[in-house]
Amino acid sequence: MAKRVRVGQIVNTQGVRGQVRLWPLTEKPSRFNEIKRVFVEAPPQGAPEVLTITSAHPLKKLVIVSFQEISDMTQAERLKGCYLTIPVEEVPAPEPDSYYHFQLEGLSVFTEAGERLGQIEEILETGSNDVYVVRQASPPGEVLIPALKSVVLKVDLAAGTMTVRLPDGLR
């Protein structure tokens, strides 16, 4: 099965014509106007696995989405809580020196001296910059690494590695 990336989560219905309120998992919610087909991750019994987007428009922090296959509130209700995904090949290329979270999660993190710190387990979105949660095997625990150009020296997606310069006192 091809790898898929989550692009949003259906949080509620909208109106009686089958529209849904979608929490976007993308920095640019306007992309839902470009996406034509989404997959429902673990769809409920009898719900469609593939949906065709017919319209999408922003509403505060959400996106109101209509699907060709969903025509009433009862059908839309069954999709509450479901994640929508697209094939990784359909994800637009990021800006230069930028990465999507799914590309960074799981990378092995090394110091500039070559010491293995661990693996990126999670990415926290804070106000000013992201923070990488790096799970350590020895000693057991985690290191929180700020996603700053002064800290992250190199990302090699092909090798599955990230090289960092730890700020003083981070350990």
Curated annotation (Swiss-Prot):
Any idea where the PRC barrel domain is?
Answer: 96-170
Q: Which GO terms describe its molecular function?
A: ribosome binding
Task: From the Swiss-Prot or TrEMBL record, state where the protein is found.
Answer: Cytoplasm
First-listed, main subcellular location of the protein, grouped into a coarse class: cytoplasm
**A GO cellular component entry from the record:** cytoplasm
Q: Mind listing the UniProt keywords for this protein, alphabetically?
A: Chaperone, Cytoplasm, Ribosome biogenesis, rRNA processing
Q: Which Pfam families match?
A: PRC_RimM, RimM
Offer one example of a GO biological process linked to this entry: ribosomal small subunit biogenesis
Domain remark from Swiss-Prot or TrEMBL: The PRC barrel domain binds ribosomal protein uS19.
Q: What does this protein do?
A: An accessory protein needed during the final step in the assembly of 30S ribosomal subunit, possibly for assembly of the head region. Essential for efficient processing of 16S rRNA. May be needed both before and after RbfA during the maturation of 16S rRNA. It has affinity for free ribosomal 30S subunits but not for 70S ribosomes.
How does the record describe its quaternary structure? Binds ribosomal protein uS19.
Q: Can you tell me which family this protein belongs to?
A: Belongs to the RimM family.
Q: What is this protein called?
A: Ribosome maturation factor RimM
As recorded in Swiss-Prot or TrEMBL, the protein's gene is named rimM
